């Protein structure tokens, strides 16, 4: 059955691919991306759904199932409501008669005012009360009472357990009173008021010991039992609790008086010269650890600590003394001052030592103003940022070259990209920003930087070469950055291209093609003749449409520095890609330690532009120095603020660098002592761009080993200067490496005068190979042995004043005079030395071949026996290869 792509269906229908994708999702079709395929039936159903709104693709039995599943939910809700009502009915029926009677009396008094009915109800009330009190425990457990009633009953039970004999006469009197007269509601209120007034008088007349409060509390409960007015009595209970608090305050006043008396005595003792003894001092010393424990106890919950924090800042955060923190670090083998920075491991160890819960936050990379766009500012659509990644020589730059219709790839030395190139391309009236990253293994940081600023990553894989190491690394960078991934299968025009094998290799590492049920687009292309490139661009636009990429055009401009260099005639320049806001010519900007004012903005074609909008790519001039690649480039209000932030950042980085030099562990001290035996190669590196400089430094530092260490004494972006020559001349065996830079005439003359060697390169392969060769020459050579021959001892001759001569038969190879020899007896090496004399009959011989007899005498060794074996060998020295 023929299948139709969703994007092609949308074009025929005259709609956008995103609209068709959303409608297909509403219908329930199994589509994952806007470029997924549809069958003829699905396409017909989607066409009908868009035109009429009728979903004919979903079968009827699914709707029935949905309705049936909804019905039991209603039934359950009804049953739950009915069960709740039944519970409420049970509660009302099981409540006690006294309360219901009480409610009916109050209602009848207010509404009707008929005293005969009230008297009957009040007469019934005391008669029912004792019956309910004498009921068994089983009945009480089954009864369901209201929460207010249970509180009153609990209070009555507690009191009656303490005072059981007083309850019986009161009950009898109640019965007699109920027979004689049933009091009205107003009379009951009046009686309770009189009793409260009398009781307050008694309380005022007897303000005695605190134990009396328990008697008063029993009295309140008795009154509440007689008056049947629980709400008012509960308030009285609260008042009595306030009396207890007054007693506590009074105790505190007495304690304060005692403390004042003690302090007066201490002042008197201090003036007494006979009291200045060690006992008082010891007491003062003992209080110090109590203070520290109190401070530590105050900290509750996890403490958020930034990753790059100084020792004194850590002590302030955890509210501990600085000396204690330094002491713990010293015990762990780290000598640190208060201004040294703590790494993640040290923070975790300190938290364990001080028994704290901490959460380590990532340190902010840039110490500049946070750019917060206005909340009310509208978010406008921006072009997608696409990064092209992949292995070396898989055709990344050739693909971009075909898209831009220019010959950039031929301009790169060795045909490999060594910088990040950023370009703008227009397709179907829409712009796309492309970032080309190098594929060489030395440029890992550049690839990760390109993946972090992008929206869509195109991984170029050669169909004839398959998945390589840098391909896997690029895929992991893109996946970690959480961006859309499109895999372009390049070099499809070659005969040995095998796309199925490539798909299988990608599926093994977790990148399954869309056709195989995965979520990744695999597009066959040929950067040489342009096959499939248009399809790739359309896929990029469809992905961008689905992502709904938007950015604010208001607020401070914010960008990322992709590459920076020092150009002659322009000074420090930086290639940036905008993230938000609009950058204009003349804006004050800051990027890491660099600051300045935007003098000019140049697009990828070298033309001047006045402003740069989000996702735009341009080269900025006017900076004070070359910023580091990956730095945040941001506009500020004026030049003063820009300079302040750049200076703060420079000071912070300097302190961090000094911290690394001062903070030394005991193990590192031992290594520094042992490094006196190490051979070092001092180097000065100058490169044309910041990214290339970082890559070269990282690659060279990996070459250091146990015998040889590379010491980079100077580095920078720009040409080789005379100051570099003088610095190189001060250190022995030093070397200047230039990458894409050339020394001028005066620099060459000074280098020749001071005997400084300068090596320049345009390909990173050649630079690394030469440094490896230099390091191999500094390393101790490898000594290998080569066996030349063997001879068996057949007879020995002892000659006075000469020594022992062994008569031998050469059984393997040849025996040479002066060569090194081992004497082997019963398979064990007895002696190692050299042959001092070799004779054939009576004549001296230089060499005796296999099958001939000869006489052999060793230097300074005469212990030779019949049956011993002479084994001759040569030592061959070879240089180590890194």
UniProtKB/Swiss-Prot annotation:
Zinc-finger recorded as keyword: no
Decide whether keyword Nuclease is in the record.
Answer: no
Q: Which GO terms describe its cellular component?
A: cytosol
Which ranges carry the tr-type G domain? Answer: 381-550
Q: Name one GO molecular function term.
A: translation initiation factor activity
List the residue ranges of the region (G4): 490-493
The record's principal subcellular location, in a coarse class, is cytoplasm
For this chain, the family text in UniProt reads: Belongs to the TRAFAC class translation factor GTPase superfamily. Classic translation factor GTPase family. IF-2 subfamily.
What is this protein's name?
Answer: Translation initiation factor IF-2
**Naturally occurring in which organism (per UniProt):** Helicobacter hepaticus (strain ATCC 51449 / 3B1)
